[in-house]
Amino acid sequence: MTPRTRTSPWLLGASVLLLLAAGVGLLRAGTPDDTAGDAHAGAASATRPVSAELVREYNRPGSLRDFVRHALAHPESGGAFYATQVLRRCRTVLATAAQEPEAHATATSVSAPVSSDEARAAATTLRQRCAGLSLDDLAERHIARAIADGLDREDPFLAMALHAGKAAYQTPERRKSLLFDLLASGDPLLIQDVALRIAVQTDPATGVRGHWFEGVFHPQSLDDSIELALYLLPCGLGLDCSRAADWDLLSRCANGFECAASRQDYVAAVLRGRPGAHERTLAIYQRMLAAVRSGQVAVFM
């Protein structure tokens, strides 16, 4: 998930994966949607994420080819989910590899103009991340097989991600139960690509879309501090949010938008000139991070 002010194709991978799974009949019986939703009270188990080793490998610079193969061999740690997310992103990278960035400089309201050299360097880094992956590796049929195999071998993250594809058709209680489990995983990629997408809720009293946090509803149109804090949350959970490895930052730079060095720098730029806003956003982020780390994820409901 990215703040509403910035639309990135890289964080749409989970949605595409969910649609693919539904299309090939991979949404299975026996998911939490088929059982009575538990009323989660109190804290989740605050433990080290099962994917901790995968996160470290995912963050390493350079090609992710070997990572994909390693991840597919470890579905018990969420590896199938990680692998299919990489394949989805790299499919887009290779599809646009022949398109060079615009030669002229561009700028957004939160950044200095982006030079063509910066854009080309970011595009090169993206291609390096996908080096060694063939067109066959990235074919729909291969990704569908990886999803099916991951479900057969009980990848917990993939099962939750696919179940989230039905969130729009669930009761609010079941949707909250799923959100609780996703956040309680403590995994930065699962939270970024899936949990934060379904965390956007509708206030039943007003019909306004926004986020619940610490018992207060924050409308998207009125409070960007919450969305910016959520944008930083995966960073604190272990994701490399520098332009060396962050798909979102790299893609925006490659496409001629801002070339922020990190998500933290981007947030600071967005809030520049608004007294106290940056400090408030960072304080919210720290409380969110502490809640996930301690298992107190009910504060997001």
Descriptions of predicted regions:
Residues 59-68, 173-175, 212-217, 223:
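Short linear interaction motifs
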Residues 242-243, 247-301:
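Terminal, low-structured helical/coil segments at or just beyond the last alpha-helical repeat
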Residues 72-80, 87-90, 94, 101, ...:
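Short helix-capping/linker turns of helical repeat alpha-solenoids
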Residues 49-58, 160-164:
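Alpha-helical segment of the N-proximal tetratricopeptide repeat
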Residues 29-48:
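Ser/Thr/Pro/Gly-rich low-complexity linker/stalk segments immediately outside membranes or between
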Residues 2-15:
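N-terminal Sec-pathway targeting helices
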Residues 52-60, 96-99, 103:
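Long, acidic/serine-threonine-rich intrinsically disordered regions with weak helical/coil propensity
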Residues 12-26, 83:
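Hydrophobic membrane-insertion alpha-helices, especially the h-region
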